[in-house]
């Protein structure tokens, strides 16, 4: 959950080990308690027996896509909220994985939100009464999808979302980092 608060020590550790500026340079974020990497690091530090059992690390919508298609996948918007993802180079960060004790094989293949990650598994198609040719898309994180839904897609467009969390999206045609982050 984004409201998870147990990971404050892990966030401080990541911000110190990598450095806020360096972390922000490739993730466009600082370490925040709601992100996946601090949660995984917390598990490593506090529940090592469960940490050792991790097969795949995925977010809820990605688990649903896996159950529908049998493929491990995520999209760029959700990957960017894990802190394992190098947003600038659009790949998993070897450095962050190493620091957290995660193997890249434990992370899903990353797609653009609109890309197809697979089609329905035969048993799922049959259960749902749908053809096996139904495509499963990578999808998007909630705020990223909301930004697109509100038309925040042109360079310099802004979307402010206030709810369980507060998010400000400013669309850009290039990678940019908030120097005050």
Predicted regions and their residues:
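Glycine-rich phosphate-binding/catalytic subdomain of phosphoryl-transfer
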Residues: 1-181
